[in-house]
């Protein structure tokens, strides 16, 4: 661990460079937040009240804001309108709201601020009713991670501080907030929610529109537009309670009472967002075969890793996401064991199969990481480091710019390596101990490492052999090959190799007859195996000088053979990879198909690399499609794609 001394912060948890607030000076005992929604003006106004303990006896409060109008400030119910200043904007962090605390103010005091959002709010997306599936009512949802809560309300906008919340909102439409419903006042169109578990600002959320609800388990509901409710119920109800029970056995009891999910409109920019009691999900998961429910397992795992135990800043994001991917794969492994036993396999064989499933999912993640690093271009040395440096040279860096699969997959692989070193049984004792130790807290990487070495004193020498500096502070892929079990992937690799070999001899008609027989092997593939098959085909690009655009005949024949399975699939993970393969070969029909597909979704996992590929093979088409669809995207997604296409 000597090699890490130079990186250890002076104090832990490390200070967050992505906030303008003086959050370390206070304990937030309670946050009371009210929203008033105006669909005509497309703004949210409201008031936030902080019950604060001034633990450092400072004479001011600094809060984060971004494109907010501040209309009133008071302390202990006394106006402070002459004692605050909204500083000029400092990109990318916004505008500091500086409030002087009167000398007579007690150590425990209340601060109340009235505010309204503006048209530049980056957290909110207002949708006209025509942009919804039901076409009956407008819709509003928000996405605050990483630093967008400050554009919704004045806040200590950092994961480094948490608070319980009391929420209320006034709107004529069905309204949901990140907590438990306490009361509905239908006469005044006002709802009241509470979140008793302390949460950081990025987990604050609001959604409203034409929303219906149905049960999918004893402690779980799913909510979405009425026209989609039956499909969502079918997709999730088989697995939901099983997911929770397996996670509880792995970690400890679920803290949040209910795990409810909201399937949002297509413009939602992520696969899921782990809002407590209001897990937000992309509609791309609704594919009719339950093959993408792993995203729900991921968001559920966040109930412990991220929501209960939180990274202290976005520099240490891997503590949220690496842990969550690890737990997600353990949950899916355990369910695979149960399924294998139900199919008559013995205990040993079932557990072996479960481990194969986990490692197969890890293979998919490894490929995603490789592809992500390739797409980073000149930024790979900066953004492929596990512990990010967001402090910047002149101004802090935007955490959104650093968002990638690195904290997810590089983080997972570090935890997987630790598990292999100490042994799975011993690591399983560490999991609940770690989450109990840091429950309700925010921590940095060094606190994790210190606790790890303290817990595994007997294995300290072995853990010290990990190349910690390479893992945490050097760019690129993980420094060791994890050598995952390829049993479930081998058939995918073999078929991809046959397709590649066929492409090399595609003018031979006899070869095509044989290829048609071989191609049908995908009929026996699971959805995940189809993903690995397509990933492997894409990966042949530029290997030993090979280029798919020189083998369009093969791509065209594959398009004929695989039309039903791939072009018409409802599985967005498969469809995106299929279009990506064909567009890599510069098949114009599929470049157009990719562009049209990007107009039906808002999930950045597909939108950003999709436009990046189109920009590479046909920039005119990429720009034309983006300009056609950009107003459909959430502000976060729109801003990132504009950067990717260098349109600003």
Curated annotation (Swiss-Prot):
Top enzyme class: hydrolase
Coiled coil stretches, renumbered: none
Superkingdom classification of source: Eukaryota
EC annotation from Swiss-Prot or TrEMBL: 3.4.11.-, 3.3.2.10
Catalytic activity: an epoxide + H2O = an ethanediol
Catalytic residues in the record: 299, 408
Binding site for a peptide: 143-145, 269-274
Location of the protein in the cell: Cytoplasm; Nucleus
The UniProt record lists the keyword Cytoplasm: yes
Entry GO MF terms: aminopeptidase activity; epoxide hydrolase activity; metallopeptidase activity; zinc ion binding
Pfam families documented for this protein: Leuk-A4-hydro_C, Peptidase_M1, Peptidase_M1_N
Note describing how the cofactor binds: Binds 1 zinc ion per subunit.
Binding-site residues for Zn(2+), renumbered to this chain: 298, 302, 321
A biological-process GO annotation: peptide catabolic process
Record GO cellular component, one term: nucleus
Cofactor(s) demanded: Zn(2+)
First-listed, main subcellular location of the protein, grouped into a coarse class: cytoplasm
Keyword set, alphabetical order: Cytoplasm, Hydrolase, Metal-binding, Metalloprotease, Nucleus, Protease, Zinc
Family per similarity comment: Belongs to the peptidase M1 family.
Role noted for this protein: Aminopeptidase that preferentially cleaves di- and tripeptides. Also has low epoxide hydrolase activity (in vitro). Can hydrolyze the epoxide leukotriene LTA(4) but it forms preferentially 5,6-dihydroxy-7,9,11,14-eicosatetraenoic acid rather than the cytokine leukotriene B(4) as the product compared to the homologous mammalian enzyme (in vitro).
NCBIfam families: leuko_A4_hydro
Protein name in the entry: Leucine aminopeptidase 2
